[in-house]
């Protein structure tokens, strides 16, 4: 939170309460501006060294500060700029201060504990920070999309092209095999839910009735997508246990700390932004266009060929079903407004957002409305309170895609609709049936009620600070934080009886209604004690605290079949079934941490421990402890090109709690026998002694600035080991259960992160900032106390992710032909994990123009393209009929035909903006105005043998290891935007 960052910054500037001002004082006035643009800097802090006196700059960058008589030194700092010490002689009463931009965020305060932080240039961990400006250049479907390519060590990928999100964030490789894989999200101290609740479309698609019964094949959205990116001030990413240990048993997958914007002292400042744009289909699979009856006969036979490619010419008509389905370019928009300001004691920030992302398929899209109010109040010189509230409403319509054993979703059914079929409606609006399949995808997109996912969400937070003790050498502060995150989600899907696949059903017409209610509540109480001896030899910060979290989720699903025509209500069917699930978990934790900054602020040492217990564990009263230790040392300035060199090392442990239900037997009470209630036990039983997975990580690195601060390099090497993995072990059939959850085994990740930034040009009229991020990780199963097993995919016929001791945790297994009696055997055929990710960013400013571009290159890695199999079966793949027939001939014996390259190069963001001259807007009372053109994913290049829609894909949603499985996904799109933003 910015409040925390400011407190830490002020604490460093004031040296924890040096001597107070003398009785004789004078007034010093001044103005703070940017050294590169000359613009006023609002909200900069101006501290008088050796006193407790601090002032802040107002709207025009001006300040007035009381100072003792005699010579003094002012320290001026602002987030995003380098601090500056300014000597002010006794005879001088005014100063002009210019601050250089801190383009590498070295002076930003980053998280080191629950209630503490340290400047990034001193931090012993590789903590990534993404600023508000970096988040909002190009509209994005979710916050995670906005940080793609900007965080070393992070693989951030969408699961499909559907509007509304569905993004996975993986930090430093594999952290679990069967546990939760998402990072912990903390927003202004509130632990946010990132639950992904399926919409229950599997009732119709039967995706869970094939070789993989997973319910996560329904293109679900993880709920962090609800956040408004415009409200975010910065994002800090703690990537591993060495940095996130203080968050305990929920931090094994990393921690994403999000701080929202706060008001600043001064007159109200308004910002209004209006964006208009559209999305378009970026890539098609390419359907084979059958030329004539002879061509069509080779796959479909003479009867079909002569019907649709009739004599005497025998020519086949050609219809582009892909573009008929997904070629919409409807208007999208984002309207955002915010205002912030306040006095010395009261500050406020209010914002509002209205957003629409139009889908490229009929009846799909995403809408969001958000309002926020953040208020900071100083009740006295010692007591401060910060409040935050956020109301969000979202509506997602994501269509019908992904795996489908009923062959009714868009791209599954399209695979059985060759190019010579006309699927368009007639003049009366009636769609024809697909004679070669079970569904007409154009009819489904038009008539299916658009799978509304309606979410209402409230997030509230409160933070109270009390300066218990403030003296020359000591400072003791109490920090209390509490918050609640609550959302309700409703999914309503209607498959009317008029649909082709419903007409052949014994109970035509299906209405699905899912209601989910989630509540996360947490509070923490923290004490932070700072001490600095009279000698000033060191600064010690001791922190300790307690934390409590209560999570509750309830889901009810209603399925109604055989509907009365035209009715959607679930009571309009003759066959109705109801399923309900409830879960609740409580966590308790405490921590203690010590931090020391010494040797003229060059040596930083930290050590701490976190203790956690949870109702999800087998023993609810047992505490699990997670220690950490870290150190960094900034070398004295040396000769040559190096300006500042920091050596750092950190070690720590964190955990990953068992998923709710892994410790007991979940009894199904929905069964009945002749109307009498009955109980059914599942095939898998819990373990009453289940405990969290334990991650141990060590990282080391070097950070260096070069060329007088015009270049910065960060290099990090890490190794993390995860023990007590959450596994399934097979049980003897005589016991009544097939398997049981258990702890055991060990996996290891090793990786390297490199971040480079260079400012080759920095003048008043021209500046250029270049950034590059490189990341590579490899994982290995070190120990496995159970037989090798599948964690994703559909068996060796179609390929699967296979866990095996001594092998990569992300290897792909499949069938390969041999000379045996069976004719094939299973072996490794690829690996999901890429060789590396490499991103490149350029930020060029020429006078009033700014051009920003971000590209990301993923090299290596494999995926399973099963969409190609579906289209092969239907004879519609681009290389049919010859090549697809050859592939079908070896189906079941050679899975390698589905393995394709996951390499891609994506131009993720491009923005060209122009700052209007004052003469263009000053008559309105505005103080700045900007116009920009931007685009997202404008260019995508893929690996040589890739033939699918997008290598950034996951049929099973967010997964620990089983990504890169493509089955009839929502197609990829590119977006274009025009933005006008004005500040008052």
Where are these regions (language model features)?
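Residues embedded in well-ordered regular secondary structure
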Residues: 129, 150, 162-167, 177-179, ...
């Amino acid at each position: 939170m910015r409040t925390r960052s400011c407190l830490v910054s002020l604490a460093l500037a004031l040296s924890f309460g040096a001597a107070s001002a003398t009785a004789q004082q004078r007034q010093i006035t001044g103005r703070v501006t940017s050294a590169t643009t000359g613009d006023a800097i609002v909200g900069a802090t101006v501290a008088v060294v050796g006193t407790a006196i601090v002032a802040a700059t107002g709207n025009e960058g001006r300040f007035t500060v009381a100072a003792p008589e005699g010579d003094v030194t002012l320290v001026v700092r602002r987030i995003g700029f380098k601090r500056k010490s300014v000597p002010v002689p006794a005879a001088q009463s005014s100063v002009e201060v210019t601050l250089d931009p801190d383009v590498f965020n070295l002076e930003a305060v980053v998280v080191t504990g629950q209630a503490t932080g340290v400047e990034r240039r001193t931090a012993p961990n590789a903590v990534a920070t993404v600023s508000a400006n970096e988040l909002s250049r190009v509209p994005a479907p979710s916050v995670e999309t906005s940080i793609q390519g900007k965080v070393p060590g992070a693989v951030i990928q969408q699961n499909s092209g559907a509007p509304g999100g569905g993004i996975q964030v993986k930090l430093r490789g594999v952290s679990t095999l069967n546990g939760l894989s998402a990072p912990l999200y903390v927003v202004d101290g509130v632990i946010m839910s990132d639950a992904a609740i399926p919409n229950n479309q599997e009732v119709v698609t039967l995706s869970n009735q094939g070789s993989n019964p997973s319910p996560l094949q329904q293109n679900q959205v993880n709920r962090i997508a609800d956040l408004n990116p415009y409200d975010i001030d910065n994002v800090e990413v703690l990537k591993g246990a060495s940095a996130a240990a203080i968050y305990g048993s929920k931090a094994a997958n990393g921690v994403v700390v999000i701080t929202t914007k706060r008001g600043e002292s001064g007159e109200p400042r308004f910002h209004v932004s209006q964006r208009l744009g559209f999305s378009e289909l970026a890539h098609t699979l390419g359907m084979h266009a059958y030329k004539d009856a002879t061509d069509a006969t080779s796959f479909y036979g003479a009867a079909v060929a002569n019907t649709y490619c009739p004599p005497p010419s025998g020519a086949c008509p050609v219809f582009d079903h892909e573009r008929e389905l997904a070629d919409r370019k409807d208007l999208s928009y984002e309207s955002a407004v915010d205002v912030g300001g306040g006095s010395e004691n009261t500050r406020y920030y209010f914002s509002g957002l209205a957003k629409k992302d139009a889908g490229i398929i009929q009846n799909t899209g995403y809408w969001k409305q958000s309002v926020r109010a953040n208020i900071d109040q100083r009740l006295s010189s010692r007591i401060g309170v910060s409040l935050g509230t956020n109301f969000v409403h979202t509506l997602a319509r994501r269509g019908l895609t992904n795996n489908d054993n009923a062959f009714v979703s868009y791209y599954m059914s399209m695979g059985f609709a060759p190019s010579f079929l006309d699927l368009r409606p007639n003049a009366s609006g009636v769609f024809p049936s697909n004679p070669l399949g079970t569904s007409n995808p154009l009819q489904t997109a038009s008539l299916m009620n658009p799978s509304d996912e309606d979410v209402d969400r409230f997030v509230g937070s409160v933070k109270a600070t009390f300066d218990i003790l403030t003296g020359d050498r000591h400072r003791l502060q109490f920090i209390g934080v509490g918050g609640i995150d609550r959302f309700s989600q409703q999914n309503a899907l209607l498959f009317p009886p008029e649909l082709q696949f419903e007409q052949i059903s014994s109970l035509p017409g299906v209405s699905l209604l899912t209601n989910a209610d989630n509540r996360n509540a947490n509070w923490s109480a923290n004490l932070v004690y700072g001490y600095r001896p009279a000698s000033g030899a060191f600064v010690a910060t001791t922190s300790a605290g307690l934390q409590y979290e209560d999570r509750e989720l309830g889901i009810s699903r209603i399925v109604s079949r055989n509907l009365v025509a035209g009715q959607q209500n679930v009571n309009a069917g003759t066959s109705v079934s109801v399923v309900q699930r409830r879960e609740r978990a409580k966590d308790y934790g405490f921590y203690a941490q010590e931090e020391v900054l010494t040797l003229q602020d060059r040596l930083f040492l930290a050590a701490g421990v976190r203790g956690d217990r949870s109702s999800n564990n087998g023993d609810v009263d047992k505490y699990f402890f997670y220690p950490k230790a870290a150190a960094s040392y900034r070398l004295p300035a040396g000769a040559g090109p190096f300006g500042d060199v920091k050596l750092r090392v950190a070690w720590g442990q964190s955990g990953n709690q068992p998923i709710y239900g892994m410790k007991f037997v979940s009894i199904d009470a929905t069964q009945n026998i002749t109307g009498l209630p009955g109980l059914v036990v599942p095939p898998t039983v819990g373990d009453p002694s289940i405990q969290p997975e334990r991650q141990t990580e060590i990282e080391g690195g070097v950070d260096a600035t070069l060329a007088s601060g015009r270049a910065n390099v960060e290099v990090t090497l890490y190794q993390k080991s995860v023990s007590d993995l959450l596994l399934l072990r097979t049980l003897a059939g005589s016991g009544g259960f097939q398997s049981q959850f258990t702890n055991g085994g060990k996996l290891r990740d090793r990786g390297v992160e490199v971040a480079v930034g260079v400012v080759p040009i920095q003048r008043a009229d021209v500046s250029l900032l270049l950034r590059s991020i490189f990341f590579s990780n490899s994982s290995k199963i070190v120990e496995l106390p159970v037989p090798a097993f599948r964690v994703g995919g559909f068996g060796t016929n179609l390929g699967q992710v296979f866990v095996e001791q001594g092998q990569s945790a992300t290897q792909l297994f499949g069938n390969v032909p041999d000379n045996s009696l069976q004719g094939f055997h299973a072996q490794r055929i690829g690996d999901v994990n890429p060789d590396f990710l490499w991103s490149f960013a350029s930020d060029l400013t020429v006078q009033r123009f700014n051009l920003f571009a971000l590209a990301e290159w993923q090299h290596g890695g494999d995926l399973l393209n099963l969409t190609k199999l579906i289209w092969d079966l239907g004879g519609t793949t681009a290389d049919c009929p010859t090549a697809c027939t050859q592939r079908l001939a070896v189906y079941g014996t050679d899975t390698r035909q589905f393995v394709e390259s996951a390499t891609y190069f994506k131009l993720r963001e491009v923005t060209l903006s122009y700052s209007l001259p004052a003469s263009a807007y000053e008559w309105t009372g505005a103080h700045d105005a900007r116009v920009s053109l931007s685009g997202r994913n404008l260019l995508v290049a893929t690996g040589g043998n890739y033939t699918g829609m997008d290598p950034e894909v996951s049929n099973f949603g967010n997964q620990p290891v089983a990504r890169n499985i493509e089955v009839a996904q929502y197609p990829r799109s590119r977006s274009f935007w025009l933005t006008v933003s004005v500040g008052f």
